[in-house]
Curated annotation (Swiss-Prot):
Tissue: Brain. Expressed at high levels within the neocortex, hippocampus, cerebellum, striatum, septal nuclei and the reticular nucleus of the thalamus. Also expressed in islets where it is more abundant in the peripheral/mantle region. Highly expressed in the nerve endings of GABA neurons in the brain and spinal cord but also in glycinergic nerve endings. Expressed in glycine-, GABA- or GABA- and glycine-containing boutons.
Record-given protein name: Vesicular inhibitory amino acid transporter
Entry-linked PANTHER family: AMINO ACID TRANSPORTER, VESICULAR INHIBITORY AMINO ACID TRANSPORTER
A GO molecular-function annotation: glycine:proton antiporter activity
Gene Ontology CC entries for this record: cell surface; cell tip; cone cell pedicle; dendrite; dendrite terminus; GABA-ergic synapse; inhibitory synapse; neuron projection
Family classification: Belongs to the amino acid/polyamine transporter 2 family.
Result when mutating residue 351 to A: Retains around 80% of the beta-alanine transport activity
Cytoplasmic side stretches: 1-132, 226-265, 327-341, 405-438, 483-489
Organism: Rattus norvegicus
Keyword terms of this UniProt record: Cell projection, Cytoplasmic vesicle, Membrane, Neurotransmitter transport, Nitration, Synapse, Transmembrane, Transmembrane helix, Transport
3'-nitrotyrosine: residues carrying this PTM: 186
Length: 525
């Protein structure tokens, strides 16, 4: 009797569990995620067995074909993606594809390139998140107060986490349970998430976001160059727009760049100069420590302008674009997490101290670019170094934007929208050079008509920065690794996606309002 009762209770519990699991699976399936049930697990195992046999057959065919002098001339070539296997549904690029060499030979290419150490990788990340845009952080504290300081810490934690989960999306387990790298770029991750229905949609979305962010970065360099020169020499009869035109004339040779060998020689010098400038600004602020206005640091926020501060802070931490290539070039990829921890901890401490000390020194008089608050004699010297750094930093995002445009629109073979920019001899065609010059001129026009450093940085950070750093990594992590995630990882990803979405929309709207208001003010003047 007891056995019969126990069996009935077991059957009831099993049926209830199966129903609840079916409901949860159905709900997540409608959302685009797949919850693995026992029957699905058997199906996946069966598919893996069939796939293993299929690839064994392919290997035998390859061995046979290697033993033959030549194949059938009338035979059709294999369809791209049939030989290469990828669990995400998107085929890997063929052995001769240019996608293999994007950025830095990942898992699928560039094995002959020298690998970098964790220290060198950390230096690259530091260059990305400790650049010139730190100069706008005191302006974020002006409108955010102590909450702005908290956001500098919070953004560092979240960006570090999303960088790690983005790299986790590059890896999957093979049949032997080994974790292997099956993707090599942000675009490949996005395509895998949208496969098989829309195998290229995700990559196009990421490419558009990358182009917007890179071009906006170029615009910001032109804006800050004109702003700094105008405030360094206010006595000269030269307007900020004229200084921007002069800066663009200096940058026009960037259109002729084929590689970054010439520019990379100056990267270390630029970074060292930037650290020296930060030290000079902090030293001046410390010399006025007696006059610090602690009472000006607010516990409340400016509701209209604080979302702009969020975009500024987020934009100063953006590095996710090149993390897949960077991790693929490391000698010890296992050290990537440790490298991310220390670089973001250092960035958080330095940014927080710089923003707080600078704001305490000038309080409500803090300007969009903090060096504009310095005395005339010091300001001219510091700003000249900053302009030099901005001009030498411009080619990096410009060249990256050109590469993304060329590979997405001009170098995809039969799928290209336009003919290739390069001739058969590797030389740049005249119309390709014209397009590059047009991109330089476009950055100038944007800098002339929207010469507001902080507002532009807030707009970019809210639009593409939040998308590439918060929204897409968390969404991709849920989509690709749903079956392996623990409940707290799912909670973190969903929370980051929701908070990032709210901050992105709010910051974008308020940044646009700020730009419209500033444009109207300039028109009235």
């Amino acid at each position: 009797m007891a056995t019969l009762l126990r069996s009935k209770l077991t059957n009831v519990a099993t049926s209830v569990s199966n129903k609840s699991q079916a409901k949860v699976s159905g709900m997540f399936a409608r959302m685009g995620f797949q919850a693995a049930t026992d029957e699905e697990a058997v199906g996946f195992a069966h598919c893996d067995d069939l796939d293993f046999e299929h690839r064994q057959g392919l290997q035998m065919d390859i061995l046979k074909s290697e033993g033959e002098p030549c194949g059938d001339e009338g035979a059709e070539p294999p369809v791209e993606g049939d030989i290469h296997y990828q669990r995400g549904g998107a085929p890997l690029p063929p052995s001769g594809s240019k996608d293999q060499a994007v950025g830095a030979g990942g898992e699928f290419g560039g094995h002959d390139k020298p690998k970098i150490t964790a220290w060198e990788a950390g230096w690259n990340v530091t260059n990305a998140i400790q650049g010139m845009f730190v100069l706008g952080l005191p302006y974020a504290i002006l409108h955010g107060g102590y909450l702005g300081l908290f956001l500098i810490i919070f953004a560092a934690v979240v960006c570090c986490y999303t960088g790690k989960i983005l790299i986790a999306c590059l890896y999957e387990e093979n049949e032997d349970g080994e974790v292997v790298r099956v993707r090599d770029s942000y675009v490949a991750i996005a395509n895998a998430c949208c496969a098989p229905r829309f195998p290229t949609l995700g990559g196009r979305v990421v490419n558009v976001a990358q182009i917007i962010e890179l071009v906006m970065t170029c615009i910001l360099y032109v804006v800050v160059s004109g702003n700094l020169m105008y405030n360094s020499f206010p006595g000269l009869p030269v307007s900020q727009k004229s200084w921007s035109i002069i800066a663009t004339a200096v940058l026009l040779p960037c259109a002729f760049l084929k590689n970054l060998k010439a520019v990379s020689k100056f990267s270390l010098l630029c970074t060292l100069a930037h650290f020296v400038i930060n030290i000079l600004v902090i030293a001046y602020c410390l010399s006025r420590a007696r006059d610090w206005a602690w009472e000006k640091v607010k516990f409340y926020i400016d509701v209209k302008k604080f979302p702009i501060s969020i975009g500024i802070i987020v934009f100063s931490y953006t590095s996710q674009i090149f993390l897949p290539s960077l991790e693929g070039n490391m000698q010890q990829p296992s050290e990537f997490h440790c490298m991310m921890n220390w670089t973001h901890i250092a960035a958080c401490v330095l940014k927080g101290l710089f923003a707080l000390v600078a704001y305490l020194t000038w309080a409500d008089e803090t300007k969009e670019v903090i060096t504009d608050n310095l005395p005339g004699s010091i300001r001219a010297v510091v700003n000249i170094f900053l302009v030099a750094k901005a001009l030498l930093s411009y080619p990096l995002p410009f060249f990256a934007a050109v590469e993304v445009l060329e590979k997405s629109l001009f170098q995809e073979g039969s799928r290209a929208f336009f003919p290739a920019c390069y001739g058969g001899d590797g030389r740049l065609k005249s119309w390709g050079l014209t397009l590059r010059c047009a991109l330089v001129v476009f950055t100038l026009l944007m800098a002339i008509y929207v010469p507001h450093f902080a507002l532009l940085m807030g707009l970019t950070g809210s639009l593409t920065g939040a998308g590439l750093c918060f929204l897409l990594p968390s969404l991709f992590h849920l989509r690709l690794l749903w079956r392996k995630l623990l409940w707290h990882q799912v909670f973190f990803d969903v929370a980051i996606f929701v908070i990032g979405g709210i901050c992105s929309v709010s910051g974008f709207v308020h940044s646009l309002e700020g730009l419209i208001e500033a444009y109207r003010t300039n028109a009235e003047d």
